[in-house]
Amino acid sequence: MEGQTGSGKSIFLQNIITCLLQNKSTEITIIDPKGGGDFAVFREREKVEILDTSEAEAAIESFVEEMESRYQSNAQGVSYESMSYKILIIDEVNDLIKNKAISANIARLSRKARQSRIHLILATQRPDAKAFEGEIRSTIPSRIALSVQKSTESKIILDETGAEKLTGRGDMLIKLVSSSEMKHILGVKVGNIQAFLP
């Protein structure tokens, strides 16, 4: 997911988290280099953990370990359906994936984690072509672009231009794994998000 300042990216992430929390067994870890201010409304939720970048490498490594543990459990007869969903949200992922160890682990998760009910949401204001080349880019099946400054930024996320023409405030283009067709949608802003939290 990408979107410049004023695009509505943070609000859209808040909406996604609110929807995910409707499933009471879902556990969410948020890595936010800005200190979690955009996600403060979730800080007291039992199933939400908000971390800063100093804790990122260890947290991502723990997700890889959990993924491998789930594969081993499944090989011993435990069904994936009995496992809780674990969601890792990384805001401003550009800076983190310059770290080779972090980049390698994100690539492992993006390649293998879905079957074990572990999912990634990667967000950035300005995607970097070098940072997003290779395995991470090819194994992230669904893409969302809110408004960006340049057509080249749109192409990094969507493989085509168009996001540079969006108007901001939740205006977005989305490509889902279930469809090759790009959709133009408008996100919403919930006035009192607390009212929708379980």
Where in the sequence are the language-model features?
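Tight coil/turn sites that cap or link beta-strands
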Residues: R169-G170
